[in-house]
Design a protein with these regions (language model features):
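Membrane-proximal alpha-helical anchors
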Residues: 1-69, 73-80
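An amphipathic alpha-helical interaction surface
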Residues: 3, 48-49, 67-69, 74-161
Length: 161
């Protein structure tokens, strides 16, 4: 009878151990999802009194911070220095632009937005705004970032347009 009690106790203890390990695995998977960042870009445009502004914004719409590991701009498919790419794309309008280049190890918090590029220019019609927007569309952005759990993700504007 004592052997039966001992074996039963051992089986119950092993079941409790297996259940605890399984619960730990499930909890860890949940924790990873609960701090997953999600980066995306969008463009805003406004025109008022023959003056227009186009802005390209980056937003972290995820549930945790995005740790920037690489920030790279491409012009017509070629990797370029950010300032050179913007100057090449915008030409004379580059002098009327404000830009933000996110450095490595920058931590973009949850729900944070950054204006990556803002261009202000005279525009008597919507066609002028559209022509500047086409120039900006020649720029592409690749951002490699990680979550608090160091899971690497890549934002690629060429795939997300």
């Amino acid at each position: 009878m004592e052997i039966l009690v001992s074996i039963s106790s051992l089986i119950i203890a092993l079941c409790a151990l297996v259940f605890t390990i399984w619960q730990t695995y499930i909890q860890r998977a949940h924790n990873r999802l609960s701090v997953k960042p999600h980066l995306f870009t969008f463009t805003t445009k406004d025109r008022n009194n023959n003056l227009a502004r186009l802005q390209v914004l980056l937003k972290n719409n995820g549930l945790g911070p995005a740790f920037i590991n690489k920030f790279q701009i491409y012009y017509k498919g070629q990797e370029c220095e950010p300032d050179a790419a913007i100057n090449a794309a915008l030409g004379e309008w580059a002098k009327n632009s404000i830009r933000t280049i996110l450095g490595e190890e920058y931590a973009m918090s949850e729900k944070e937005s950054e204006v990556l590029l803002s261009v202000t220019f005279p525009a008597e019609s919507d066609e002028v705004v559209e022509s500047i927007e086409k120039k900006i569309d020649q720029l592409d952005l690749i951002i490699e970032y990680s979550s608090a759990y160091e899971k690497m993700e890549t934002y690629d504007s060429r795939k997300n347009s």
